[in-house]
Amino acid sequence: MPRSLKKGPFIDAHLFAKVEKAVESNSRKPIKTWSRRSMILPQMVGLTISVHNGRTHVPVIISEQMVGHKLGEFAPTRTYRGHGFDKKAKK
């Protein structure tokens, strides 16, 4: 079930403060965050945010199409190495 419109989008306060500061100072430095649950707001467009995926920080460049999605959607947590293969078929 999606979040109620009257509540508005969720974003962690510490991340919002960093975004406001970066927009105000026109900073190009990536913003490092562990907050995968925060929603992408229109103010973030053009910024680079490094989102933690459990092991490293993945740089995500925010574009117009990402607004309304969560930051965690753009930093995959699992590495897919393909399905198992048959050793006999390889020979």
Curated annotation (Swiss-Prot):
This is Small ribosomal subunit protein uS19. Protein S19 forms a complex with S13 that binds strongly to the 16S ribosomal RNA. The keyword Zinc does not apply. Belongs to the universal ribosomal protein uS19 family. The keyword rRNA-binding applies. Pfam families: Ribosomal_S19. It comes from Psychrobacter sp. (strain PRwf-1). InterPro entries: Ribosomal_uS19, Ribosomal_uS19_bac-type, Ribosomal_uS19_CS, Ribosomal_uS19_SF. One of its GO terms (biological process) is ribosomal small subunit assembly. Keywords: Ribonucleoprotein, Ribosomal protein, RNA-binding, rRNA-binding. HAMAP family: Ribosomal_uS19. One of its GO terms (cellular component) is cytoplasm. GO terms for molecular function: rRNA binding; structural constituent of ribosome.
